[in-house]
């Protein structure tokens, strides 16, 4: 084994003692055998690098300077915004007498900080200014101005955007790359293959070629009718002689030429024009300009750099990417395209072309469109860039119109420019685009994964319904680029993926992954990034290929991935290997890399495990896992939810909300600490300071833990003592039995914060008012409100309690003389208002922890028509309860069925009761054995060990301490603890006070029944497993309705918890009652409990008065059915048993009189908003 290094998880040194290091984090003891030359890169670089390029900030400039210094020419040297403004300049009027050009976009300082934006519901943005230059071409006069182009949203340090006060993430999109593609499809009518080729531009018309079953080479311009390719060549100025000279050896081209009737270039142009514009009189000039505009005009057609790069590589053309003309097609491109297609049709395997200025042999083959060489990433920067481009092109139209209408002398850049379309385009993108999403802030991992997501959906991408099996499938080129495991279950499976942990995006938008360079069978630590295309041409060994001490392959032959990707791995001589994986976890995403013993889990369950870690709720106290993978530290730090030192220095001041450091360079840095803030998902976002005054920190040292982190490590759940056994059938079908200790000690309790808001507006009848003076409400109901009518902080509230008192003016009715007299005597006070207070919704309760009041009188920015806005934050501590969903990291999920008293739980020989009982039948069928190995290793880590002598299994772990107490261990993905190592450690665990070892080398022990004290008959697997509490809490799902809102038309109760709806008694349920003959129950359900308006009021009346329940009437939906049939001109009448017609009355006045008497309203129509509910 190569050096068999035991690497500490977060650094590459060999410090193995489990001591606190300078930055406060404990070191994990790692079981890794493989030395990794490369640390995991910054996990948010995908977002931040792209945005840096767009705005061209200092970080980006530094990166460009470094790349230029190293001689890397592929890096873009102009920023995204500069590119767009350069592209649109100059805007000329229709005669070309005036022009307007833009340059040097730059940003002023943002108006508010990010925290203020969240507070005020504002967008975190900076004003964008551009230098605009207007030139009168006739006089040569130039006017220059700096023009404001609107507020431009800025990315926060964490890779998010704050839009209208909420954090959003822009997801990167996976799209088909511009370039040249060749396909082969079988013809339905004959046994021949049809060959097609197309050039897909970044924007502009498609160019398609096709060889049909008659071996005719056709061309389709701009998706219109097909015509002969020789016609196009002639229109481009080729003669028949030239065509024969270039393509004479191909039968298909000769056959096409024979059928072609056009003689001259003019004929060919007219012929093309007739096909593209049928019905218009053809002229040579019109045809020439049409053809030019389609493919040869940079304003209308753009291959983009990546399209030119792909065409150059595919067709062996040597045109510089920096060339001004590189973005449009050229005749040589079209000729090379035709040549490639006819060679493919003729069955040739190679063609000669050029690459990097040298002759190069091209492989002639069809393209696989799902290959990652043909799919690229549009990251944030490019998505916003496209949006700004759309806005600017709309603005361009306005500028042109204004140039013609305004007086030339008076024109300045400012008078021409209307920034509205630009601002609107940006706003529309952040507000409504499919790719701008409400950030998943459930825990640090869910946020991190959200930012690293790759989606094939969205504008210009695929749609769920049209995406076939092939696009969704795992492809060999995904290796090291997109995780094969982490993807949603359901309709989006395979369309949404996650970037692999080491992947990065190159300037063309292709995903690259790093490999170690190998020469002459010696592996170096030099790392090279390869795209999927490059990778297909080299031989790559796995990360676990055995090496000797000199980093040479220790075996003659090495297993590598075959050239061209796909297929089975092959054995080749060691000297032929060119590259080697940098790390075994290279192929998986961050969430998947957090699953220990992933190599022992079935992929379907691993998928669920990776997805469910993102649903874990941050608990009141976080605890790092005993068994981790060494990825916990990197994930927590890069997610940005822990506060880390930006510079080395000494802490001078510590409080709950602020930590101040004096840095070594003499500057001072303030670190803000969040206390009990609300995340997007309603979880508690809280920081805990870990440092003391006078403590020294290096760069990256942990200052404060965030939600679900422990000492700077990701900590999504709790280590619980589990037993795999059945218990009275209560853990049937994945149900879980939990100990009362977990509830009593708040082990799995979490804090949830709800935000309630209400505004006081101007209505037609007068202004609404926030007040304590609410009509018809007793004093004790108002006890919690202060003099403003707003609840005070610290109040305990239940469902239905008033949070903010508000009254709205009622419509003034015609007053009776008596009321007029009262009005005259008592003045305005008896004016009618109704109570529209903000109340705690059904099924919610908690403690008020915050109140924010925005008032127009205090110069707060409020929407038009709103005078006051009040926000109340209510926090509730949710203890774990039956019905909550728990899960492990291996896709093993279940619902708590029973919480047992501690004394009834099964216990170990030393009296320790287990915390949780899982059903052993959940393991074999699901094939996620990783959970069992985790359980055993968890026990070992908890008890610590003492290794006697030098057993065989220790030889691979020279750096494992021979003796340790309770510790945390890391078992990296695909390079973790082996079975014999776990067995050996189980045999070496520390003994109890009595000198007993509770669990033997099989990982099993004797358990005793807590109820009887008798031992269970067989040994049972017991150990520590990391258990997560998921965000599927029973309190949010349980729901019951007494009376509530009814639908407008059918008068039936609404459905769903949000509408306070009822449970639908559907068709099949009706059949069940019919089968039992339960006629009266059924009649009640279909009438008075549903939509018999008259009946339900009468029943309520009867219940209140203690009388018998009256006969039901006719359901409203029956009346709707009759109306529907009458509207189809069918005369439907309802007859009684004796044949007389029954009048269908509309809702009777009696209903309303009864309702008035009872003081209830049972005819409520559906509410117009959730607030009314």
From Swiss-Prot:
For this protein, the Enzyme Commission number is 2.7.7.6
User: Per the record, a Pfam family?
Assistant: RNA_pol_Rpb2_45
Q: Which spans does this entry mark as compositional bias, Low complexity?
A: 8-22
Q: Which GO terms describe its molecular function?
A: DNA binding; DNA-directed RNA polymerase activity; ribonucleoside binding
PROSITE patterns per record: RNA_POL_BETA
Q: Where is this region: Disordered?
A: 1-23
Q: Which cysteines are joined by disulfide bonds?
A: none
Matching entries from InterPro entries are given as:
DNA-dir_RNA_pol_bsu_ext_1_sf, DNA-dir_RNA_pol_bsu_external_1, DNA-dir_RNA_pol_su2, DNA-dir_RNAP_su2_dom, DNA-dir_RNAP_su2_hyb_sf, RNA_pol_bsu_bac, RNA_pol_bsu_CS, RNA_pol_bsu_protrusion
Single GO cellular component annotation?
DNA-directed RNA polymerase complex
SUPFAM superfamilies the record matches: beta and beta-prime subunits of DNA dependent RNA-polymerase
Q: Which family does it belong to?
A: Belongs to the RNA polymerase beta chain family.
Briefly state the protein's biological role. Answer: DNA-dependent RNA polymerase catalyzes the transcription of DNA into RNA using the four ribonucleoside triphosphates as substrates.
Protein's name in the database: DNA-directed RNA polymerase subunit beta
Q: Which organism is it from?
A: Paenarthrobacter aurescens (strain TC1)
Gene designation per UniProt: rpoB
